[in-house]
């Protein structure tokens, strides 16, 4: 009996992981979480719909880099590839001295469980080369997202 329960639990976990990966499928930016999510000096946070329901957010994933100096070229390259391929629309960018400091992008909508979800990527370089990279999906629109920030 324990084996059956364990097998069902593993199948459910794999299904949830597959659905999450599918949500970011086709994005170069998705590889940022895979590449740096468990790296020393990086904090990864993932919150589910249960934690975020009052904000109309279904999924929140973020990476906080203590020092993004080494990772920054890869992150910027992924963002540029996604922009060039038309997989995301620029909502706002702040560039200072030729360097991207803040960016808000909207991704194509996602159909999931009879819902149409909006998806966003947020990126900000802070003081002392710290940085935050965020992926959000939910029912909120871009104006609501900006109001939350």
Regions found by a protein language model. Give the residues of each.
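Surface-exposed, polar helix/loop patches in the mature regions of secreted/periplasmic/lumenal proteins
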Residues: 85-148
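Bacterial Sec-dependent N-terminal signal peptides
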Residues: 1-29
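Compact soluble domain cores
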Residues: 64-100
């Amino acid at each position: 009996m324990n084996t059956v329960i364990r097998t069902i639990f593993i199948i459910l976990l794999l299904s949830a992981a597959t659905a999450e990966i599918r949500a970011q499928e086709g994005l170069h930016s998705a590889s940022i979480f895979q590449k740096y999510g468990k790296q020393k000096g990086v904090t990864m946070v993932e919150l589910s719909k249960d934690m975020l329901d009052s904000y109309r957010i279904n999924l929140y994933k973020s990476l906080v880099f203590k020092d993004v100096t080494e990772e920054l070229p890869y992150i910027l390259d992924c963002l540029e590839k996604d922009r060039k391929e038309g997989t995301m629309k620029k909502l706002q960018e702040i560039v200072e001295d030729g360097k991207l400091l803040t960016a808000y992008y909207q991704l194509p909508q996602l159909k999931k469980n009879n819902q149409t979800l909006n998806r966003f990527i947020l990126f900000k370089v802070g003081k002392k080369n710290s940085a935050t990279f965020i992926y959000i999906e939910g029912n909120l629109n871009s104006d609501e997202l900006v109001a939350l920030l």
